[in-house]
């Protein structure tokens, strides 16, 4: 089984995240996609609880898109992959990353181990993905997703404009907006 691994804070989950997840599954780039929300190991400000982020993500769970917070306590991506390989024996893993991540991929802890995985890289801006792959010595085992419309959304921008109903409606699904309002999340 080919399992895609999509790791992030998802603070909050927005239409861009879901568009990516659906694209990967609908185009059969993987058999199953695991969305793994992380703890706040990097000192991000205004991050809500893991449970609230999981609750918002669960609204998007399907038979092929699985929200898995079992490994959220692990700090590094390579640790998550190691744990997943024990849970899903005999599976192949693909790591989903944005092109902005490939620029500094060699700074990731144990990035050499992650390079052994298939990388599914989402084109962003004008980043020359092939240049960075060559620099990393990754000549095969990757997919560059360039036919997905560029997604100019960031969770930070959404949080910074949490009072602007038009921005919320543009970038978040109604269920997520309702959850944020009900729980009074991201309020200053």
Regions found by a protein language model. Give the residues of each.
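Nucleotidyltransferase catalytic core that binds NTPs
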Residues: 1-188
């Amino acid at each position: 089984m080919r399992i895609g691994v999509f790791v992030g804070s998802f603070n909050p989950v927005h239409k861009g995240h879901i568009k990516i997840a659906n694209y990967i599954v609908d185009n059969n780039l993987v058999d199953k996609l695991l969305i793994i929300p992380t703890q706040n190991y990097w000192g991000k400000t205004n991050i809500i609880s893991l449970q609230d982020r999981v609750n918002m993500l669960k609204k998007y769970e399907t038979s092929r898109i699985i929200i898995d917070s079992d490994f959220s306590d692990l700090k590094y991506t390579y640790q998550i992959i190691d744990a997943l390989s024990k849970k899903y024996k005999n599976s192949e893993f693909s790591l989903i990353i944005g092109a902005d991540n490939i620029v500094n991929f060699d700074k990731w802890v144990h990035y050499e181990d992650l390079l052994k995985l298939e990388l599914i890289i989402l084109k962003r801006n004008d980043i020359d993905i092939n240049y960075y792959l060559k620099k990393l010595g990754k000549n095969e085992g990757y997919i560059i997703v360039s036919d997905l419309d560029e997604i100019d959304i960031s969770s930070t921008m959404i949080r910074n404009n949490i009072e602007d109903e038009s921005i919320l409606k543009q970038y978040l699904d109604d269920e997520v907006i309702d959850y944020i309002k009900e729980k009074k999340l991201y309020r200053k």
